[in-house]
Amino acid sequence: MRLFNWRRQAVLNAMPLVKPDQVRTPWHEFWRRFRRQHMAMTAALFVILLIVVAIFARWIAPYDAENYFDYDNLNNGPSLQHWFGVDSLGRDIFSRVLVGAQISLAAGVFAVFIGAAIGTLLGLLAGYYEGWWDRLIMRICDVLFAFPGILLAIAVVAVLGSGIANVIIAVAIFSIPAFARLVRGNTLVLKQQTFIESARSIGASDMTILLRHILPGTVSSIVVFFTMRIGTSIISAASLSFLGLGAQPPTPEWGAMLNEARADMVIAPHVAVFPALAIFLTVLAFNLLGDGLRDALDPKIKG
């Protein structure tokens, strides 16, 4: 016994001491990969700044975005008083772009959230149960995919009526099949894994398997696609507002601002440039952030 204890102590002494801060969790691995991607980090900072601006836009904006009118400077370009210039009604474009960030970002995020929630549920059911569940859900997705996204959104808004709330519903509807197919594919792969068979063998219910084992395995893919889909949704919402089907004047939504700027683009191009630039930078940032998240969450990528 004494010899055994001596040998055990010798083995323990030979083992390197691992400090708590040296233990690498999945979060540490993700952060290590993500922070090496400079474009993704820049995009993440931009998105964080955009979210802060959107939350506090009403307080940050130097002028009232809807009820301030400077009739002495109609269509004037950028100046110290009005950083982005003034539109044809005398409204401060900088203030309207800031408040527009709140509306456009909320429309994009809520639309994708609704589409992701419904699409994830349908994808889990189709991939796990297969059979008629799978055939029914996938045929519905095929029908929705047969229409161009913006055309489907226009049709939905035409039925429901104009307004930002209906735009969110319309954009969410054509986001559903994309998430459903993504989650279905992941579910079909995960349900064949041995840990799923083990869960079944101990009597785990289908609900437990779906929520505790399969859904967590699809989260990384959902997060990446969710992030990139926000940019698409912002463009779609802005397009509908540009066509007069979304936010209505004087609401300072970016697409609606572009619609109002059409008549003055030749004599006052700044009226359209700044809302368009806001859309471009926001969509680019979300796409770059999504690319960075995908690379950081991909277990095959080594630092």
Swiss-Prot record:
Where mainly located? membrane
Spans traversing the lipid bilayer: 40-60, 105-125, 144-164, 165-185, 222-242, 266-286
Entry's InterPro entries? BP-dependent_transpt_permease (IPR050366), MetI-like (IPR000515), MetI-like_sf (IPR035906), OppC_N (IPR025966)
Whether Nucleus counts among this entry's keywords is no
Question: Which residue intervals define the domain ABC transmembrane type-1 in the entry?
Answer: 101-290
Query: Which Pfam family, giving just one, matches this sequence?
Result: OppC_N
Q: What are the alphabetically sorted keywords of the record?
A: Cell inner membrane, Cell membrane, Membrane, Transmembrane, Transmembrane helix, Transport
- Might you report a single GO cellular component term? plasma membrane
Source species, domain of life: Bacteria
Where does the protein end up?
A: Cell inner membrane
The annotated topology with respect to the bilayer is: Multi-pass membrane protein
The keyword Glycoprotein appears for this protein: no
Gene3D superfamilies registered for this protein in UniProt: MetI-like
Give this protein's Gene Ontology molecular function annotations. dipeptide transmembrane transporter activity
Assembly, per entry: The complex is composed of two ATP-binding proteins (GsiA), two transmembrane proteins (GsiC and GsiD) and a solute-binding protein (GsiB).
UniProt lists the family membership as follows: Belongs to the binding-protein-dependent transport system permease family.
Alphabetized PANTHER family for the sequence: GLUTATHIONE TRANSPORT SYSTEM PERMEASE PROTEIN GSID, OLIGOPEPTIDE TRANSPORT SYSTEM PERMEASE PROTEIN APPC
What name appears for this protein in its UniProt entry?
Answer: Glutathione transport system permease protein GsiD
